[in-house]
Amino acid sequence: MTAAPPGSPLRPRRLRAPGRIGRLFKVAAVALIVTVAGVGLAAYLGSGLGEPTLIIYTYPSLFGGPGTAAYNYVFDTFAAAHHVHIEVEFPPGNLVSTLRAEQNAPVADLVIGLDEITAPQAESYGLLVPYSAPGLADVPAQLVREISPSHGAVPYEWGYLGIDYTSAFANRTNGAVAHATFPDFATNATWASQLLTEDPTVDITGEEFLVWEIQYYEQVLHQNWTEFWSAVMPHFSPYKPAPDWGTAFNEFSSPGGPAMVVSYTSDPAYAAYYGTPGAYNSTVSWWNGAAYGWQTVYGVGIVNGSRHLRLDQEFIDWLLSGPVQTEIPLNEWEYPANSTVAVPSVYVWAPNPDLIQPLNVGTSPAQIAASLPGWLATYQELATQYIPP
């Protein structure tokens, strides 16, 4: 995010698709390579020590990004314990597209940051090697089902998409926004005009929001999902769908910005942690007193063609271990996949995820991967027809 609570550092978000920026880092036109092997940050030129090199593709904001205590702890500790060099690379654009382009001559050993939408895509292309990690015994089976039932991607963190809203808007609606339904936006021009979304044709957060809305309409309302967009899109002025999450949140958090933005339910906890509790809150989609949301699940996978399968597996085991999982809530601002790891008390500011019914359970990763191209094409047709020029 390029705007944040006063006095707080910029909060990173993962970069997994074209147009999506992190709160701290932007990907350069070429991959940035960072080496971690107990020597800090440096370009890896080869040490001549005969130690193996593990190449990891991920997003620039992982564990706060290079140089942070959490990032260095995760990679340096593993490198020292296993006598291995680690190259962390941040490919431009989409992780799946990078892996697919290199499929005939794989470069990476591991990929961190695939989600419930991109992981099944990677699996469909044969890009991943399944691994049934022992640590999955402490991971809820639901998370595994939602990202990769075949263990091609192993979940390490999760969360929920949310609709963030300002305290001022909550007051104007007498608190009604806290239990908003999608039909509330479809039938209220004021609400629709104050909702800033991300363009799903270029942004992963936008894709996830589109899937959330579709599943809500199909599973909860049993209605045509296009009705929502045809009703709200004519009011997308001046706040047209943003090209990425960072742009959207920056606009939301700037003076005179929209009252609501599609983001993540952990945002209020982040704001409270950095000294502005209640600056904004977050909600999911409600109906008849029940909360429904879209669960985002992030995983790590072994790249098909890796030359270091045993090291790959040991790194995944490390990523699921308590010491690493403890770093997730205050660095990734997500929930740890390891259910034995507690989240800090500041998460009381976020909506209780235990009270949200995940819409993911009504579909499967494979179904989403197969349906997404058609959904995006339909969305684009609606946008062309209804969004004001």
Language model segments and positions:
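Short beta-strand->loop
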Residues: L128-D138, A153-V154, P183-A186, Y273-W294, ...
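Early extracytoplasmic/lumenal segment of secretory-pathway proteins
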Residues: L49-Q121, N250
